[in-house]
Amino acid sequence: MSATEPHTDQPRTLADLCKVCNIPMHSLQLPCAFCKKTVCTAEIYAFQYKDLFVVWRHGFPHAACALCLELHGQINYRRHRDRACLWETVEQECGKPLEEIFIRCWLCHKPLCNVEKQRHVDYNRRFHCVRGYWKGRCLHCWKP
């Protein structure tokens, strides 16, 4: 097992980590998995809201700060974008309606809600396949 692989008994979410450690989320002090700086409380809550998983390194939990998440998103998008498709193609490739397809924002990593997916449809914007996962833009990161 590598240093980044979690043991099966290690919590995967911040909420689970808080339960296991019996501490409130606002008391968590975790390093960023990328820059190693302590992730601030607002970023801890944003990490949980974005439904991201805890990264385990050498037995210690890590989260990610907003700046590193955005930078990591941009790097992945630029280096690993496989293709860009309109919603019809995404539905066809996945074999299910857009509402049932899990899509994250490629910039901030938040899961897109149905309103955000519909915005791509309404504005004829493409979804992007990055490392085998479909990505789009959330309302916060949307740029016309």
Curated annotation (Swiss-Prot):
First and last residues of each zinc finger (unnamed): 32-68, 105-141
Keywords recorded for this protein, A-Z: Activator, DNA-binding, Early protein, Host cytoplasm, Host nucleus, Host-virus interaction, Inhibition of host innate immune response by virus, Metal-binding, Modulation of host cell apoptosis by virus, Transcription, Transcription regulation, Viral immunoevasion, Zinc, Zinc-finger
GO biological process: DNA-templated transcription; regulation of DNA-templated transcription; symbiont-mediated perturbation of host apoptosis; symbiont-mediated perturbation of host ubiquitin-like protein modification; symbiont-mediated suppression of host innate immune response; symbiont-mediated suppression of host type I interferon-mediated signaling pathway
InterPro entries in the cross-refs: E6, E6_sf
Keyword Aminoacyl-tRNA synthetase: no
Zinc as UniProt keyword: yes
Alphabetical list of Gene3D superfamilies matching this protein: E6 early regulatory protein
Disulphide bond pairs: none
Any single Pfam family the record assigns to this protein: E6
GO CC, any one term: host cell nucleus
Record GO terms (molecular function): DNA binding; zinc ion binding
Subcellular location per the Swiss-Prot or TrEMBL entry: Host cytoplasm; Host nucleus
Principal location: host cell
Protein family according to the UniProt entry: Belongs to the papillomaviridae E6 protein family.
Other notes: Belongs to the low risk human alphapapillomavirus family. The cancer-causing human papillomavirus E6 protein has a unique carboxy terminal PDZ domain containing substrate but low risk E6s do not possess this domain.
Function: Plays a major role in the induction and maintenance of cellular transformation. E6 associates with host UBE3A/E6-AP ubiquitin-protein ligase and modulates its activity. Sequesters tumor suppressor TP53 in the host cytoplasm and modulates its activity by interacting with host EP300 that results in the reduction of TP53 acetylation and activation. In turn, apoptosis induced by DNA damage is inhibited. E6 also protects host keratinocytes from apoptosis by mediating the degradation of host BAK1. May also inhibit host immune response.
Quaternary organization: Forms homodimers. Interacts with ubiquitin-protein ligase UBE3A/E6-AP; this interaction stimulates UBE3A ubiquitin activity. Interacts with host TP53 and EP300; this interaction inhibits TP53 activity.
Descriptive protein name: Protein E6
Provenance organism: Human papillomavirus type 54
Gene name of the encoded protein: E6
